[in-house]
């Protein structure tokens, strides 16, 4: 069974929610059919998914997967080995973004990347039901239409934080 999972990220950045996701999932399935035929394999039974995309979201400047931005402004921190190419590059070109890791200063650094959520983005102060409705929308408009066959479909990977006063509503 061939398997691909074309994922979306940056959903809470505000642009994706205005797009026709069913049409996009059809494009994914058509392209999968074309490429599978071209390389001589079966087309995938499941084509679309949503998963968190930490590094990808940093590179693209988007929110991660389906998740809201942490806040309007914040600092995102990543640990990297001092033997990695990104460390050497930043040390030479942007040393202000680097600091030694507290626990492993001899071989690990922390990169601090300022973040700014774009205007119109969803931030984590949203209500839990808004998050759950977004998951439901993406599951029904992107993930399910990208499913061709079999009893198991891909899913929307999400961590849902429920505040103490939201448990009754969330169920």
PLM features: residue spans?
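Catalytic alpha/beta core of large soluble enzyme barrels
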Residues: 1, 52, 59-171
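Short capping micro-motif at the N-terminus of alpha-helices
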Residues: 45, 58-59
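Internal maturation/activation junctions in enzymes
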Residues: 3, 8-52
């Amino acid at each position: 069974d061939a398997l691909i999972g074309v994922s979306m990220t940056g959903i809470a950045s505000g642009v994706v929610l205005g797009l026709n996701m069913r049409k996009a999932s059809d494009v994914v399935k058509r392209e999968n059919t074309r490429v599978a035929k071209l390389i001589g394999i079966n087309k995938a039974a499941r084509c679309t998914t949503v998963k968190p995309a930490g590094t990808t979201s940093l590179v693209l400047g988007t929110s991660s997967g389906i998740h809201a931005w942490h806040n309007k402004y914040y600092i995102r921190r990543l640990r990297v080995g001092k033997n990695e190419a990104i460390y050497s590059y930043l040390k030479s070109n942007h040393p202000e973004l680097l600091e030694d890791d507290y626990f492993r200063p001899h071989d690990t650094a922390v990169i601090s990347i300022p973040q700014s959520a774009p205007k119109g983005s969803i931030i984590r102060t949203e209500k839990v039901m808004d998050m759950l409705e977004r998951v439901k929308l993406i599951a029904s408009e992107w993930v399910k239409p990208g499913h061709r066959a079999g009893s198991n479909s891909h899913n929307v990977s999400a961590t849902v934080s429920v505040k103490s006063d939201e448990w009754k509503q969330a169920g």
